[in-house]
C-alpha cells in the first residue's frame, strides 16, 4: 500500500502529485498564520473555564489561591487608570515619569513569568505504544506540543515510525500538514517563516486539528493545557500592546491609547489567574476520572471470577442474593460519588456566574460613566460651537453694515457724478446755443449791405498797423475778422481774377480736406459693427473754420510757460503754428493752427485696409523697446481681424440669394398684414407733433408780420434762417428714422442766371465770378465744362457689362457651346442666388468645376429684378425668346409718408421763404428713390 492511503490522506491522483498537494497545504497554512497573533484555529474555552480578572479573589475552589506574584504591577495599573480618568480633559502628559517606569518594569517582569509558565505547561510529551495506534494517531501524538520546525519535526517522526509498513518522509510530511497545525502564542516578526521559525519569543506549538485523533485518556489534559496556552497568549498580547504605547514617542499626550491599552490589560487574566484556572480544570478532570475508575473497580472482581471459572472449568454455586447485594451497593456508592461531583460542579458554575455578573455590572457602570463624560464633552463642544457661530454672525452683521455704508457712499458719489455730468451737459447745451448765435451773427454780417463794407474801407490804414497779439486772447475775434477781410476783398474790384479765385478756392478745399477725418482713404464704408447708433451730422463750415483757426490751448500754455511741465503733453503732439494768409489783401493776421501729421499703418498678412490718420496719443506701456505689449486703455477685441470678411466680386449684398419659397412666403406675409392688420399704424406714420411743424412756422411768420414796421429787417432774415434750420433738422431726423438718405441740392439758386449772363459790371460781375468758381470742375485742360446729361439706365447697363467682362476669365470658355442651351434652361428656371444656381448646374455637369460654372453664369446672364436673367443677345443666338420679366414697381419712400408729414400746398404758396421743392430721383443703380430737397428758396 502507498503511504498516502496508509496515512488516511484522500489522494486519487498518482504519487507524483503529492508535492503539489503539499504546496497547496503549505500555502493555506501561510495564509492562515499571516496574522500577528493567532495561526490557523485556536482552541476555544468552555464557559466553565472562565476566571475572575486581576484583583477579584478566587472563590469556590477546593484549595486556597496562592498569593499574587506581582502585586506592584496591579497597583500600578489601578493607579494609571485613576490618573487617566483625572487627566482625560487636561492637555498635559498622561503619566508621570515614575509611574511610566514602574509600569514598564512590572510588564517586563510579568512577561518573564508568563514565558516560564508556558514552558512548564507545554513541556509534556505523550507516552504511548506504537503498535496499538494507527499511523495518523501515532503522528498526532508525536507532533502534539512540539516546538520544532516542519523539517525537523518530520525527520523526528520519521525516525520513530520508519519501522512501520508504508511510512516514508513524504507521507509523514503530508500527514503532519493534514492533521496538525502550528500555533503561535507569543510575539514574532511579520517576515518570519510560519513553518520553520523557532524563535523563543514566538512560543511556537504544534497541535492536532481534531482531538479525536488522540486517544481518549489523553484528551482531558491536552484540552486543559491548550486553555492555559490561550490565556497566556492573550496576556502576552495585552502586555506587548501596553509596552508599544509606552515606548512610542509622544506617548505622554496619547490619553485615549493609554486608556485602551490599560482596559485591554485589565480584561486579560494575569499569571495568577491563569494558574488558578489550570488548577481548577485539573481538579475537575481528576474527579471525573475518579468516578469512572470507581465504577470500573466494582466490576473487576466479578469479571475476574467469571474469567477464572471459565478458565478452570469449575463452576461454583454462588449465592445470587449476595451477588446482587454487592452489585447494588457498588452502584449506590457510584451514584453518590457522581451526585457529589455534580453538586460541586453546579456550585462552582453558580459562583462563576455570580462573578461574571458582578464583572459585567462593573463594566456597565464604567461604560455609563464614560458616556456621561462624553456627553459633558459634547455639551461643552456644542456651547463652544454656538459661541463661535454667534461671533461669526456678529462679524457678518458688522461686515454687512460696512457694506451698506460703502454702498451709500458709492451712491452719493454716483449722484454727485450725475449732478456734475448734468451740469456739464447744460454747459455743452449753452455752448451750442452760443455757437448758433455766433452763426446767426455771421450770417447777419454776410447779408449786410454795402455800407458795412464801405465802413471797413475807411480805417484801412489801421489794419496794416495791427500788432500781433497772444493767440489765446484772439480766439473769439477770429471769425469776425475773417468775415471783414472777405468783405474788404470783395470791395477791391481791380484785384479780382478768375485764376486767383480758383487758386484760393482750391487751397481752401485742400486745407479743409486735411481736417476732414472721413475723407481719408482706406476707411471702411460698411463695417460689420456700427460705429454710431445714429447718424451724426457734420458741423457747419463756420464751426469747422472756427475749430481750425482756434489756437491750441496746450500750445499757448507751452508758449507762455516753457519750463513748466504739462501732464497732457504725453497725449497730444505739440506742433508749431502755421500762419494763414489771405490772397489779394494787405491785411495779415498770424493765426496759429495745428498742422497734424498723418500716419500710415499697414500690417503684414492682414486682409484689412491700412490705417491712415492721426494718432496723437502716446502710450505709457507700448514703446520702441516693448512694441508687442498690450495697452490697457485699448480694446483689442473690437477691431480684430476676425471681424473682417472679404466679399466676392460681383456679388450683391442685398437679399438676392433668397429662395423662391422665402420670397413667396414674404409676399404672403405682406398680403396677410395688409388685409388682417390694416388697423396697425403704417411704417412712416407720424403723430400730430412729429411731422414738419408748418403751423408753428406760420405762427412765427404771423408774429413777425404783427410786429411794428420799424423793426430791423435783419431780425426777419435771422428768423427765416432759424426756420430753415428747424425744417432741415426735422427732415434729417425723419430720414434717420427711416434709414433713408436725404440729398440737399442747391442747383436752383435764385442767381443761377448770372452764370450765363453777359455784359455785367460792378457787383453783378463779382457775383458771377464767385458763382463760376463754386460751380467749376477742374479738368486737365483747365477749362470750365458742363457735365452732360447721361441716362442712368444706359450708364447702369454699360457699367454692368464692363463688370461682367472684367469678372469673366478665360477659363469660362472651357465649357462647350453644345451645353449652353442646357445652362440657359437651368438659369431661366432657377430663382435662387448664384451659389444655389451653381450647385444646380454642377449636378448636371459634374466634370466642370464650380468656379468655371460661376464665371459662365456671370458671362451669359445678369442680375436683374432680384434674380439672374440670360442676356438677350445670348437668347437670340440660341433662337430662344426672352421671358417677360416681372414688372414689379419698387415702392418709393414717398409712399411711407402720410400727407401730414409734408407741408401743405397753401402753406408753401403763403410763405415764399418756406417754399421747398421735394423731388424724387433715381440713384445710380436705379433701385431706390432718394428724396432731394432744395434748402434755399428760389425766385421762380
UniProtKB/Swiss-Prot annotation:
**Where found?**
Nucleus
Query: Coiled-coil region(s) at which residues?
Result: 329-439
Main location, first listed in the record: nucleus
Q: Which GO terms describe its cellular component?
A: CAF-1 complex; nucleus
Induction annotation: Cell cycle-regulated, showing a peak in the G1-phase.
- Tissues expressed in: In embryo, expressed in leaf primordia, coleoptile and radicle. In seedlings, expressed in cell division zone of roots, SAM and leaf primordia. Expressed in floral organ primordia.
Residue ranges annotated as compositionally biased, kind Low complexity, are 430-440
Q: Which InterPro entries match?
A: Cac1-like_C (IPR048800), CAF1A_DD (IPR022043)
DNA repair in keyword set = yes
One of this protein's GO BP terms? regulation of G2/M transition of mitotic cell cycle
Q: Which ranges are annotated Polar residues under compositional bias? A: 320-329
Keywords, alphabetical: Chromatin regulator, Coiled coil, DNA damage, DNA recombination, DNA repair, Nucleus, Transcription, Transcription regulation
* Deleted gene: phenotype: Dwarf and weak seedling that dies during vegetative phase.
The reply to whether Nucleus figures as a keyword in the UniProt entry is yes
Region Disordered, as annotated, extends over 317-473, 638-682, 919-940
Compositional bias (Basic and acidic residues) = 330-429, 445-461
Q: Where is the composition biased (Acidic residues)?
A: 638-650
Similarity-based family: Belongs to the CHAF1A family.
Q: What's the subunit arrangement here?
A: Component of the chromatin assembly factor 1 (CAF-1) complex, composed of FSM (FAS1), FAS2 and MSI1.
Which PANTHER family does this chain map to? CHROMATIN ASSEMBLY FACTOR 1 SUBUNIT A, CHROMATIN ASSEMBLY FACTOR 1 SUBUNIT A CAF-1 SUBUNIT A
Q: What is this protein called?
A: Chromatin assembly factor 1 subunit FSM
Amino acid at each position: 500500500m502507498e503511504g498516502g492511503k496508509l496515512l488516511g490522506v484522500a489522494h486519487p491522483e498518482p504519487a507524483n502529485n503529492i508535492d503539489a498537494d503539499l504546496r497547496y497545504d503549505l500555502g493555506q497554512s501561510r495564509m492562515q498564520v499571516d496574522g500577528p497573533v493567532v495561526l490557523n484555529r485556536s482552541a476555544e474555552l468552555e464557559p466553565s473555564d472562565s476566571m475572575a480578572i486581576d484583583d477579584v479573589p478566587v472563590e469556590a475552589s477546593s484549595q486556597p489561591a496562592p498569593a499574587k506574584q506581582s502585586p506592584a504591577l496591579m497597583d500600578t495599573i489601578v493607579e494609571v487608570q485613576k490618573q487617566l480618568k483625572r487627566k482625560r480633559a487636561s492637555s498635559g502628559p498622561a503619566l508621570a515619569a515614575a509611574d511610566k517606569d514602574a509600569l514598564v518594569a512590572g510588564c517586563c517582569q510579568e512577561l518573564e513569568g508568563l514565558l516560564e509558565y508556558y514552558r512548564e505547561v507545554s513541556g509534556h510529551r505523550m507516552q504511548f505504544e506504537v503498535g496499538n495506534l494507527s499511523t495518523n494517531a501515532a503522528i498526532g501524538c508525536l507532533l502534539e506540543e512540539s516546538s520544532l520546525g516542519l523539517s525537523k519535526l518530520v525527520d523526528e517522526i520519521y525516525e520513530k515510525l520508519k519501522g512501520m509498513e508504508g511510512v516514508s518522509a513524504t507521507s509523514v510530511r503530508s500527514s503532519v500538514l493534514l492533521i496538525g497545525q502550528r500555533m503561535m502564542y507569543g510575539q514574532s516578526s511579520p517576515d518570519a517563516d510560519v513553518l520553520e521559525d523557532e524563535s523563543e519569543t514566538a512560543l511556537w506549538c504544534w497541535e492536532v486539528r481534531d482531538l479525536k485523533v488522540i486517544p481518549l485518556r489523553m484528551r482531558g489534559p491536552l484540552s486543559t493545557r491548550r486553555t492555559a496556552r490561550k490565556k497566556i497568549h492573550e496576556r502576552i498580547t495585552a502586555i506587548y500592546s501596553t509596552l508599544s504605547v509606552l515606548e512610542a514617542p509622544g506617548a505622554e499626550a496619547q490619553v485615549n491609547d493609554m486608556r485602551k491599552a490599560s482596559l485591554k490589560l485589565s480584561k486579560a487574566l494575569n499569571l495568577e489567574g491563569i494558574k488558578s484556572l489550570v488548577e481548577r480544570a485539573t481538579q475537575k478532570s481528576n474527579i471525573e476520572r475518579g468516578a469512572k475508575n470507581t465504577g470500573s473497580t466494582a466490576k473487576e472482581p466479578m469479571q475476574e471470577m467469571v474469567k477464572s471459572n471459565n478458565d478452570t472449568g469449575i463452576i461454583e454455586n454462588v449465592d445470587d442474593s449476595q451477588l446482587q447485594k454487592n452489585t447494588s451497593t457498588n452502584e449506590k456508592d457510584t451514584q453518590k460519588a457522581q451526585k457529589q461531583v455534580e453538586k460541586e460542579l453546579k456550585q462552582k458554575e453558580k459562583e462563576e456566574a455570580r462573578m461574571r455578573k458582578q464583572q459585567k455590572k462593573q463594566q456597565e457602570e464604567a461604560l455609563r460613566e464614560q458616556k456621561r463624560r462624553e456627553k459633558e464633552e459634547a455639551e461643552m463642544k456644542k456651547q463652544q460651537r454656538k459661541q463661535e457661530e454667534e461671533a461669526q454672525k456678529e462679524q457678518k452683521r458688522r461686515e454687512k453694515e460696512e457694506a451698506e455704508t460703502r454702498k451709500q457712499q458709492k451712491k452719493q458719489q454716483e449722484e454727485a457724478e450725475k449732478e456734475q455730468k448734468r451740469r456739464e451737459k447744460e454747459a455743452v447745451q449753452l455752448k451750442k446755443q452760443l455757437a448758433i448765435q455766433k452763426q446767426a451773427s455771421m450770417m447777419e454780417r454776410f447779408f449786410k449791405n454795402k455800407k458795412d463794407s464801405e465802413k471797413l474801407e475807411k480805417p484801412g490804414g489801421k489794419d496794416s498797423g495791427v500788432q500781433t497779439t497772444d493767440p489765446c486772447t484772439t480766439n473769439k475775434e477770429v471769425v469776425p475778422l475773417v468775415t471783414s477781410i472777405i468783405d474788404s476783398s470783395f470791395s477791391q474790384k481791380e484785384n479780382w481774377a478768375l485764376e486767383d479765385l480758383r487758386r484760393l478756392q482750391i487751397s481752401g478745399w485742400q486745407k479743409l480736406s486735411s481736417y476732414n477725418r472721413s475723407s481719408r482713404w482706406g476707411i471702411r464704408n460698411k463695417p460689420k459693427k456700427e460705429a454710431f447708433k445714429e447718424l451724426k451730422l457734420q458741423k457747419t463750415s463756420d464751426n469747422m473754420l472756427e475749430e481750425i483757426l482756434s489756437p491750441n490751448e496746450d500750445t499757448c500754455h507751452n508758449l507762455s510757460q516753457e519750463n513748466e511741465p504739462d501732464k497732457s503733453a504725453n497725449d497730444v503732439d505739440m506742433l508749431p503754428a502755421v500762419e494763414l494768409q489771405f490772397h489779394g489783401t494787405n491785411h495779415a493776421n498770424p493765426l496759429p493752427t495745428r498742422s497734424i501729421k498723418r500716419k500710415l499703418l499697414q500690417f503684414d498678412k492682414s486682409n484689412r485696409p491700412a490705417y491712415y490718420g492721426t494718432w496723437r496719443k502716446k502710450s505709457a506701456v507700448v514703446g520702441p523697446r516693448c512694441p508687442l505689449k498690450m495697452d490697457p486703455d485699448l480694446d483689442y477685441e473690437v477691431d480684430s481681424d476676425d471681424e473682417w470678411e472679404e466679399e466676392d466680386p460681383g456679388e450683391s449684398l442685398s437679399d438676392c440669394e433668397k429662395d423662391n419659397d422665402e420670397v413667396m412666403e414674404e409676399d404672403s406675409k405682406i398680403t396677410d398684414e395688409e388685409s388682417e392688420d390694416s388697423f396697425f399704424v403704417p411704417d412712416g406714420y407720424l403723430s400730430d407733433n412729429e411731422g414738419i411743424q408748418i403751423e408753428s412756422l406760420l405762427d412765427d411768420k404771423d408774429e413777425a408780420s404783427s410786429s411794428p414796421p420799424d423793426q430791423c429787417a435783419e431780425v426777419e432774415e435771422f428768423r427765416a434762417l432759424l426756420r430753415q434750420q428747424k425744417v432741415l433738422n426735422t427732415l434729417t431726423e425723419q430720414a434717420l428714422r427711416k434709414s433713408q438718405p436725404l440729398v440737399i441740392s442747391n442747383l436752383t439758386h435764385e442767381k443761377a442766371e448770372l452764370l450765363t449772363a453777359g455784359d455785367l459790371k460792378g457787383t453783378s460781375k463779382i457775383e458771377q465770378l464767385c458763382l463760376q468758381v463754386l460751380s467749376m470742375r477742374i479738368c486737365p485742360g483747365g477749362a470750365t465744362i458742363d457735365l452732360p446729361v447721361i441716362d442712368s439706365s444706359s450708364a447702369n447697363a454699360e457699367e454692368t457689362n464692363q463688370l461682367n467682362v472684367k469678372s469673366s476669365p478665360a477659363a469660362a470658355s472651357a465649357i462647350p457651346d453644345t451645353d449652353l442651351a442646357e445652362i440657359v434652361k437651368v438659369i431661366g428656371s432657377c430663382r435662387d442666388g448664384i451659389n444655389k444656381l451653381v450647385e444646380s448646374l454642377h449636378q448636371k455637369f459634374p466634370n466642370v468645376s464650380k468656379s468655371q460654372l460661376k464665371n459662365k453664369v456671370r458671362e451669359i446672364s445678369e442680375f436683374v429684378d432680384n434674380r439672374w436673367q440670360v442676356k438677350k443677345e445670348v437668347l437670340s443666338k440660341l433662337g430662344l425668346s426672352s421671358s417677360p420679366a416681372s414688372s414689379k414697381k419698387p415702392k418709393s419712400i414717398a409712399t411711407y409718408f402720410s400727407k401730414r408729414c409734408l407741408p401743405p400746398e397753401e402753406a408753401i404758396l403763403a410763405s415764399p421763404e418756406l417754399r421747398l421743392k421735394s423731388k424724387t430721383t433715381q440713384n445710380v443703380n436705379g433701385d431706390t428713390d432718394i428724396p432731394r430737397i432744395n434748402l434755399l428758396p428760389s425766385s421762380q
